[in-house]
Amino acid sequence: MSEARKTPQSHFTGPVVIDPLTRIEGHLRIEVEVKDGRVSEARSVGTLYRGLETILVGRDPRDVQHFTQRTCGVCTYTHALASTRALEDAIKVEIPKNATYIRNLVLGMQYLHDHIVHFYHLHALDFVDVTSALQADPVKAAKICSSVSPRPASADGFKAVQAKLKAFVESGQLGPFTNAYFLGGHPAYYLDPEANLIATAHYLEALRLQVKAARAMAVFGAKNPHTQFLVAGGVTCYESLTPERIAEFEGLYKEVNDFVNQVYIPDLLLVGGAYKDWTKIGGTANFMTFGEFPGDERNLESRWFKPGVVFDRKLEALPFDPSKIEEHVRHSWYAGDAVHKPFQGVTEPKFTFMGDKDRYSWMKAPRYDGRAVETGPLAQVLVAYLKGNAEVVPVVDSVLQTLSLTPGDLFSTLGRTAARGIETAVIAKKTGEMLQEYKENVASGDKKIV
């Protein structure tokens, strides 16, 4: 197994531009000025004006979800759900229990799908040297894999992956990997050949598993991407009440859940053990989460993941106040400098030019109580951990113990990567629990979904 090493340090001075940044679905350019290997100035440039706010003006609010979820082809459902919740908040409608269960089940599978895709297909090449896998010993790789996972591993399976990889490299048709600087021995790669072979094999397997998660979403959501089952006041998928449809969802869920626990989490720990120095980079100071998985859509505090904020890397979760969220456009390609609450926002495009260091992005800058805050898995896991979530705390403690880390190490690139896996594991377990509760509620005779 690979040993932890120290990240090579650069003394470069000059500009660095990454365009496009390929770790997201969207159009993002990063510009940084570097002095002696340290970033002295940075700009995040949203290069595409989507104009969703402009498109929605004058439209029936019941249709909004179908536009907003086109923001992304991966995390589609979350935008539809947010739009539907906004409408429900405006008209003060009550949501049936079954509808809340179904929404949460689809959301659970959305999380599992997204995090598997991110770890393997968007992030893996930051730490996995694919070509190094060709030098691996498949027998040794199988032994390593079996030692960290309850799922048996086969040397023949790893040999087959090597053969497929060898044919791919020798074909010369490398597609997006053509002229890739990171292939073939970059000094920032720490994994040994066997770990690289394991990760490459699971990269390929995850391509099939993410389809299973997407299919599970479509069982209740009608399609994926871009679900078609939400309405203000509930859901429209009456078939979701039938034993056949529930069993189909459950079968797909179990396959994805097994992959999470038997493949993703062991891979995360294998990688994390080699990249301990990632605890020294990528840290931010402030975090915010709305929480998620409500018992009652009208009550933020009913959410299983509680809302909260963390400031200045202190291991303390503070109360969340949505009224403290504001949008700034001072450095964006929009008219004016005024600060607005999101529900009072103004979207009046005013492009200058690329390279302008004063106004340089189509993205607005949201702030919480005047501070830039990180959202996402690390924020949600931090708040849940610090608030004593009974399901989250033992998983966080186990990961920290396995990697010989402290809670303070979570404020880092490695902490963020670990948090995504932790969030996946606990949501996978919670989704199974919600599914059982839903089945029992339907069996009791409750058939109301809207």
What positions do the PLM features span?
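Active-site bordering "gate/hinge" segments
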Residues: S2-V450
